[in-house]
Amino acid sequence: MGTPASVVSEPPPWQAPTEARGRKQASANIFQDAELLQIQGLFQRSGDQLAEERAQIIWECAGDHHVAEALKRLRRKRPPRQKPLGHSLHHCSRLRILEPHSPLADPQSATETASTEQYLHSRRKSARIRRNWKKPGPTSYLHQIRH
């Protein structure tokens, strides 16, 4: 069958491509030639509360291999995000809890409570009607057959 083209065209693994030979070699410590203010700014932008102290430690110990290993494991800190409500809790976010008031103390609050109860009852009734609106009944089925 022959040799696949991808195998023939790839260079041997021990030979680096020509564009890679001209590149600067990677350093284990990325902060080796950085200034203190640059390191502080980097930590501040990542949201670190102790940015100045961490930058000072890294700048002083730039040649230490333990610091280089710690920097590899360092991940960018993000402020905690507010999680969106789940589907099951989303409808509960619109519910209101009515504070209990004594009807004798404030006659206006009693009328407000009554009007709120009427409002909630009408909402429930309209939701029930909407739910039942599209349910097929025996008359709608016969109507479809005749036409």
UniProtKB/Swiss-Prot annotation:
Xref: InterPro entries: AVPI1 (IPR039579), Avpi1/C8orf4_dom (IPR020282)
Q: Where is there biased composition of kind Polar residues?
A: 108-119
UniProt region (Disordered), positions on chain: 1-27, 99-147
Name the keywords, alphabetized: Cell cycle
Organism's domain of life? Eukaryota
Q: Name one Pfam family in it.
A: TC1
Q: What does this protein do?
A: May be involved in MAP kinase activation, epithelial sodium channel (ENaC) down-regulation and cell cycling.
State the name under which the record lists this protein. Arginine vasopressin-induced protein 1
Q: Which species? A: Pongo abelii
Name the gene that codes for it: AVPI1
